[in-house]
Amino acid sequence: MYNIFKGLITALITPFKNNKLDLYAFESILNQQIKHEVDAVLIAGSTGEANSLSFEEYKLLLKTSVEIVNNRMPIISGCSSNNTAYAIELAIASKKIGVDGFMASPPSYVKPTQHGIYKHFEALHEACNLPIMLYSAPTRSGVDFSDETILRLSKLPRILALKDCGVDLERPMRIRAIVKEDFNILTGNDEVVLAFHAQGVIGWISVTSNIAPKICKELLDKWYNNDIQGALEMHQKLLPLYKALFLESNPIPVKYAAHYLGLCENEIRLPLTEASDSAKKQIKKIITSLSIKI
């Protein structure tokens, strides 16, 4: 099975206007990603405020994505839930709508055992024949995959990748040593993208590429083309932006940054709130200093 989980994947924000999906802004955001040739987009993940979407909004967002992208790049949906039956419902809807794969984290809040995590993903795998990427974000979910659980899950035919949002630089090497060769590991942490690539990672699921897809794509292309020094120089230049986009809980800062650049309204759903004045000031300063434009 072809592995779609690789390269630069943008974890897209979800724009709102008057507390409804702003599909006009969403089309503009998607077209920017297509223009700058990112390798795939992730819809309705953490950055996309998936927890705040109704099931109908979720399906509409995916349907709109499929129509706009029109097979020009893979679309990955977020199917995380602490209710296994609902996660399956999200996955089945994703398949029916026409996305290319989905990502899911271990169930949050309920703190399942490793066996429970395995059974959750086994149920997802049996219910839907889309390719699956595991999502490791323990600061959000409260639990994480053990290396042994990743190994067990990687033996299921359609579980093809792991998104690792941590900073344990040994982990990619440990996982690479035990899983099948075509199982991909991607980083979901912008600040350590090159450090993780040096440890065997072959993809970047980025928040920053919402507002700087061209720069992020160039950075990763330099790395893949063995221009290590060029990639390091770009990465160093972007470090202040990475940090600014995590001054407060994601996606609060990136939603404001997108608004500042004219991509969407600065509207975010509770329990998240708008960026503080201090964060806004820092974000504007860094965007200006880097001459980022859409």
Swiss-Prot record:
Family according to the record: Belongs to the DapA family.
GO MF annotations, alphabetized: (R,S)-4-hydroxy-2-oxoglutarate aldolase activity; 4-hydroxy-tetrahydrodipicolinate synthase activity
PANTHER family xref list: 4-HYDROXY-2-OXOGLUTARATE ALDOLASE, MITOCHONDRIAL, DIHYDRODIPICOLINATE SYNTHASE
Origin: domain of life: Bacteria
Site entry (Part of a proton relay during catalysis), positions: 46, 109
Name listed for the protein in its UniProt record: 4-hydroxy-tetrahydrodipicolinate synthase
Active-site annotation: 135, 163
Pfam families tied to this protein: DHDPS (PF00701)
Gene: dapA
Alphabetical keyword list: Amino-acid biosynthesis, Cytoplasm, Diaminopimelate biosynthesis, Lyase, Lysine biosynthesis, Schiff base
